[in-house]
Every structure is written in C-alpha cells, then in structure tokens.
Amino acid sequence: MEHKVFTDVERFSREKHIHVPLFTSERTKVLLLCLSAGLTVPPHSHPGFDTTLQPLKGEAILPVDDGKEITLKPGEIYFVDGAMSFNPRNPFEEDFEMLIHLIKR
C-alpha cells in the first residue's frame, strides 16, 4: 500500500500548471493538478484512457462541447473520455487543486 498526503506533495507555480504524479501502475495513473490563480492548462487529451476529474480545492472553468463551460468545484467528480481535448483554466483568485485518475482502456 502506498500513501500520500496532498499538502506534502502539492506544488504551485505562478508561471505554469504542475502535474504531480502520485501513483502509477500498469493500467492506472493518478495525478494531482496544481493550477495557480490566473493560469490555464494548454488543450490536451489522453487517448486510450478513461479519465476522472475530482476537484479538491478552489474552482476552475472547463470548456466542454458546443462552446459551453462548466465550473469544476470540490465535492463533485467528472468522467471524461480521454480522447476529448480539455483545458481547465483558473480565472479565480484562489489556487485550484484536482485529483486526476487515468485508467487505461
């Protein structure tokens, strides 16, 4: 069994988003996204993976189909097809932190 404490591994940069690898196995990757206020993750996808997004702290905006946007908030979880391009942005004053699970299909 492996164990991590978020406050021990979180890292924020005012210049770019940071993905902190937490756990990796043959089929699964677990990452902690640390997105400082005012930053945006460049558009990207994870082909061949199913992806869950679980916001832990702060809020961020995620563009979705048809030009709509959703607000990612703690207490919610989202499933994203890894082939879909996504790029969360944090226009808010508080830093944003999100747990990302990538599960190989």
Where are the model-predicted features located?
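Short histidine-centered beta-strand/loop micro-motifs
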Residues: 20-24, 33, 41-46, 64, ...
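Short, conserved beta-strand element in jelly-roll/cupin
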Residues: 34-36, 47-62
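Ligand-binding loop in jelly-roll beta-barrel domains
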Residues: 82-105
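A short, N-terminal "cap"/entry segment at the start of jelly-roll beta-barrel domains
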Residues: 1-29, 42
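Short acidic-glycine-tyrosine-enriched beta hairpin
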Residues: 66-82
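Short, charged/polar surface micro-motifs in flexible loops or helix N-caps
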Residues: 27-28, 37-39, 57-60, 84, ...
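A generic "binding-loop/recognition-motif" signal
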Residues: 28, 37, 48, 68, ...
